[in-house]
Amino acid sequence: MKILKIINNNVVSACDEKGKEIVVMGKGLGFGKKSGDILDELKIEKKFSMPDESVTRLEELLRDIPYEYIQTANKIIAMAKEKYGMKLSKIIYITLTDHLNFAITRLKKGIVVENALLWEIKRFYQREFEAGKSALEIVKHDLGFELSEDEAGFFAIHILNAQIDADMMQTMNVPGITKDIVNIVGYTF
């Protein structure tokens, strides 16, 4: 597999065996490398293939996120799958990593975002909320940041949105909750 573009020391754009551009992640994957170099496939931890326009967005997103946050998001996703038996789509690797980065950025700046739907999330999505609380423990242990219970609710929504084979009534309610969250964040900033 050949490197097309170095995004950062841990993320590169490469050409797969079918000639399609993919984004791959792994500790030190891009360190000391340049376009055209052969990729050390033993260092690859995650591969993402998607439509061309999405590859560019993913590259932009991962360029500015510390690798430790990416690893922590991966650990949270693995926990949700293993501990709670959740089947999650690959998009959660992007959305959860982005959210984690944004949550820590807000915390560092002293910006508090209250989750106005926290009560509903706790009541109607208990399993996802428990996974969200477990995510807070992982963040505290791995990164040293203590995020609020509101963030457990936000993590729960990301997990809920990414679930495959989720109950249809539950899934139908997600767009409404997502819209409410976007409105809350919009009013806050």
Language-model region placement:
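A cross-family "folded-core" feature that marks the main globular domain of proteins
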Residues: 1-189
